[in-house]
Design a protein with these regions (language model features):
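Hydrophobic, aromatic-enriched alpha-helical segments typical of multi-pass transmembrane helices
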Residues: 1-226
Length: 226
């Protein structure tokens, strides 16, 4: 690890997010969704999927964090030492978001993966769709606050900070890189649901992957060690 260049360390963030994308699809593809069908319970569609999918998603969410942590440390060091952004408010917002992501990304996979397992158990025990969805929503209420806060702090803060730093030319990246953030890419992902429900899974993580890819390729040289 010590022999790795700064670019290689930052690229570990892309590896981490690639693992997260796989976990996202295991969690979201063909499971829960929204519908206009008047017969659907609370406008929710739900399907039983194998428990192993959620177990593997949790493992991937947990396993990707060490790689992401290494990438975060290196990227923040580059921004502080090479680009002198330590005192910038936008950078501080960016730093908070990335530090928060180390915990939040593991939580989102482990915490949310419990919900479809509860649904599966409900369907197995009762065979009643409405009752099973109700049980799932009850469990969801216990994690909705930290989930919402994590989303705001991580995805919200990093998007605002990234767009601000790019617009102010604080980083040597082109304006086209503005879109390389989790919120914009997640919004693009919503369009995928018109093709198939759940196809938007992984687009938030893809936004993070693109952000780290841009930073790895543009902020440091190939063999540079900051």
């Amino acid at each position: 690890m010590r022999r790795m260049t700064s670019r290689q360390r930052i690229l570990l963030g892309c590896l981490a997010m690639a693992m997260a994308i796989v976990g996202d699809f295991l969690l979201g593809w063909g499971t829960f969704g929204m519908t206009d069908d008047p017969g659907a319970y609370m406008g929710i569609t739900a399907r039983v999927a194998p428990d192993w999918r959620y177990a593997l998603s949790s493992v991937l969410g947990f396993a990707c964090m060490p790689f992401f942590a290494v990438a975060v440390l290196e990227l923040l060091k580059v921004m502080e030492k090479k680009y002198g952004l330590r005192e910038s408010r936008l950078y501080k917002l960016f730093r908070i978001a990335n530090w928060g992501g180390i915990l939040y990304f593991a939580f989102i996979h482990i915490g949310i993966c419990m919900l479809p397992v509860v649904f599966n158990a409900g369907m197995e025990a009762t065979g009643d769709m409405a009752a099973s969805i109700g049980m799932t929503l009850r469990v969801a209420k216990s994690i909705v606050v930290p989930l919402a806060v994590g989303f705001l702090v991580c995805d919200g803060f990093v998007t605002v900070a990234w767009i601000g730093m790019v617009l102010k030319n604080m980083l040597p990246v082109k304006k086209a890189a503005l879109v390389c953030n989790p919120l914009v890419i997640a919004l693009v992902g919503q369009l995928m649901n018109y093709i198939a429900e759940g196809l938007d899974s992984g687009f938030e993580s893809l936004g993070w992957l693109l952000l780290y890819l841009v930073c790895a390729m543009k902020l440091v040289g190939r063999d540079e060690r900051v």
